[in-house]
Curated annotation (Swiss-Prot):
Subcellular location as annotated: Cytoplasm
One term of GO molecular function: translation elongation factor activity
Keyword annotations of the record: Cytoplasm, Elongation factor, Protein biosynthesis
Chief localization: cytoplasm
Protein's job: Associates with the EF-Tu.GDP complex and induces the exchange of GDP to GTP. It remains bound to the aminoacyl-tRNA.EF-Tu.GTP complex up to the GTP hydrolysis stage on the ribosome.
Protein name (Swiss-Prot/TrEMBL): Elongation factor Ts
Source organism per UniProt: Mesomycoplasma hyopneumoniae (strain J / ATCC 25934 / NCTC 10110) (Mycoplasma hyopneumoniae)
A Pfam family annotated for this UniProt entry: EF_TS
CDD domains in alphabetical order: UBA_EF-Ts (cd14275)
Top-rank lineage group of the source organism: Bacteria
Family stated for the protein in its record: Belongs to the EF-Ts family.
């Protein structure tokens, strides 16, 4: 290999890893000038700045739901800032990872990270490369994938801003029904899918609260027949539950009927609903910009 070719390789590795010139040169010399092997060498030796970003919090990013004739998938790809999430390199990476995840079988996130692209690079390495190239920590945080049959109606919905993605699997029904449910779940974010999923303790709390409210607000409630009381209480309880139970909620596209009735009218039953929203459950780091600038000034003055 000519000296010019070697310098070109060093330049390329520097652009990818953001590591110093000397370290890039050493990495390539120890890797027979193979870029991928050199990246691994830098990561193992801790010279790559991508590795030094690994302890940062990545709570922004994008989610995406995809399907093919056999499987359906939803996953979350994170960055440190929403600005980077709009970067075309980040968007391209998300699309590539989505294709790899959909085309390959895996049982958990750890297995998913081992899936290789056409060049033999695992997803974990693609994330390291993206971290070095983009300049922020990039992570594949979570993924859900399942197979489905012809008897099921499966549809996906990813909100236009890429912050919310939903998959819906129905027994019976059709794709339009599944799509409407996915859009409903994206908008209202119900905590539970079915009433029977609500914990008994929570149900008992609601029942006691509703009974007190009925005696206080419903005229002559205590004098009404037991069957009338039961009907009033059920209606009040269901109304409160509809704030967080999918099947009891008025359908987002037609508030005249509940999701439960909408499904029944179309001979469909809910089998699985999965909703991902970017950053949910992550404790975001609050950065004091002024303090950060002052710290950098102090460090500079010490030099």
């Amino acid at each position: 290999m000519s000296q010019i070719d070697k310098m070109a390789k060093i330049k390329k590795l520097r652009e990818i890893s953001d590591a110093p010139f000397v370290d890039c040169k050493k990495a390539l010399e120890n890797s027979d000038y193979d870029i991928d092997l050199a990246i691994n060498w830098l990561n193992k030796s801790g010279k790559s700045k991508a590795l030094k970003k690994s302890d940062r919090i990545a709570a922004e990013g994008l989610v995406l739901a995809k399907k093919d004739p056999n499987s359906v998938l939803v996953f979350e790809l994170n960055s440190e800032t929403d600005f980077v999430a709009k970067n075309q390199n980040f968007i391209n990476l998300q699309q590539k990872i989505g294709e790899l995840l959909l085309a390959n079988d895996f049982t958990n996130l750890e297995d998913a990270l081992l899936i290789q692209d056409e060049a033999g690079r695992p997803i974990s390495e693609l994330l390291i490369l993206a971290t070095a190239t983009i300049g922020e920590k990039i992570t594949l945080r979570r993924v859900f994938k399942t197979k489905y049959s012809l008897e099921q109606s499966v549809e996906v919905y990813t909100h236009s801003n890429g912050q919310i993605a939903v998959i819906t699997i129905l027994k019976g029904g059709n794709l339009e029904i599944a799509k409407n449910i996915s859009m409903h779940v994206a908008a209202l974010n119900p905590q539970y899918i079915l009433k029977i999923e609500v914990p008994n303790e929570k149900l008992q709390e609601i029942q006691l609260e509703v009974e007190k409210k009925a005696f206080a607000e419903v005229k002559n409630f205590e004098k009404k027949p037991e069957n009338v009381k039961a009907g009033i209480l059920k209606g009040m309880i269901d109304k409160q539950l509809s704030e967080f139970v999918l099947e009891l909620q008025p359908l987002a596209t037609d508030s005249a009927i509940t999701v439960e009735k909408y499904l029944a009218q179309n001979s469909a039953t809910l089998e699985k609903v999965v909703r991902f929203e970017v950053g949910e459950g992550i404790q975001k780091q609050n950065v004091d910009f002024s303090a950060e600038v002052n710290q950098q000034i102090q460090e500079f003055q010490k030099k």
